[in-house]
Amino acid sequence: MVIDFHVHAFNPKVAEKAVEKLQVCSGITPFTRGTAEETIQRFDEWGIDKGVLLSVATKPTQQRVINDWCAEQDGGRFISFGGIHPDAEDYEQEIAHIKELGLHGIKLHPDYQGFMIDDERMDKIYDAIERADLPVIFHSGYDCVSPDLIHSTPERALNMIKKHPKLKVILAHLGANMMWEPVSYTHLRAHETELHLV
């Protein structure tokens, strides 16, 4: 079975706009218009059996809509993660909702959500995710949305992991997109944690 562990698709109401913004920012031509249906068509073309669907709440008000949509996509070809926003006052309730929906983890994107991965204000959120026994996947390394400020460097990720050694952490982009040199060192130092690089 082939599973793509990092898939982005969007609610049809926002898919076209989201993909356009990402294309302008990254300079990368997308393979779909960002819908779940087109993504599944590409899975078929490329021999992919399932994909881990990762959606980002870029505003606190988006959490519930995104999580309910991700739950609708879950099963079949998608293994859906939910999303919370660090500025949402109701993050604990939303984590409980994610768990109730049967979603498989939580996606956080430090660049799009405006936090450093090792920021102390995130500790209570990481503790709540750990209590819910859910894995959390982070964008890590470079992102075109904030090219001059990397919100999740390998060193910062390691700082966070040391404070939360029981948190099930997945660092996307092999631990640091376009920052390959420090990744192996960080990974070796974090060997006693629940750290996974995808």
Where are these regions (language model features)?
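Active-site neighborhood of phospho(di)ester-bond hydrolases with catalytic His/Asp-centered motifs
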Residues: 2-5, 54, 81, 107, ...
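An N-terminally biased module of ancient metal coordination in phosphate/nucleic-acid-related enzymes
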Residues: 1-56, 61
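Active-site gating/metal-coordination segments in enzymes
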Residues: 49-50, 60-152
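Short, catalytically relevant binding-site loops at active-site mouths
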Residues: 143-145, 175-179
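Histidine/acidic-residue-rich catalytic or RNA/ligand-binding cores of hydrolases
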Residues: 15, 148-155, 179-185
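Conserved small/polar residues in nucleotide/adenosyl-binding loops
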Residues: 186-193
